[in-house]
Amino acid sequence: MELYIVRHGETLWNKEKRCQGTIDISLNENGRELARITGEALKDVHFDKIYSSPLSRAYETACLIKGDRDIPVIKDDRLKEVCFGNMEGMCMDDMLKDPDSHFQHFFDAPHLYVPDENGESLEALCERTKGFLVNELMPEADSL
């Protein structure tokens, strides 16, 4: 099995350096163009299926990469971005400067990252995505 992992295209919040997490922000025009370019680069690659987060930025990216090929695009909640809870929508630069913020730990010391009361722990994120890998990909894999 060959597995291609592609990140979604750019959104307005990416450009503004805002924390997105599970808030459903659509692609901007540059993000759509980047997804089309990626689709063009992958046009000769055979895909049996495309899996996507149900968030519109990821699903739209997947559909633009697929183009007019007859390939199912399957939405799966387990592929959503990590939930940053109350930090979603906030300016990342501000959070990274705040010495009391756990946000920086997410990137440089994940073992110290503590989500807020509405956020998702890295352990929960790993369990969620592991469930996707084990249940969806491993049964079909010769080896992964």
Regions flagged by a language model, labelled:
Residues E10-E60, D116-K130:
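Loop-to-helix element that buttresses phosphate recognition and phosphoryl-transfer chemistry
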Residues D44-H46, E136-L144:
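Glycine-rich phosphate-binding loop signature in dinucleotide/nucleotide-binding domains
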Residues T129-L137:
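A short, acidic, amphipathic alpha-helical segment used as a generic capping/interface helix at domain edges
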Residues N14-K15, V82-M87, Y113-E117:
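A short acidic, helix-capping loop that chelates divalent metal ions and anchors anionic groups
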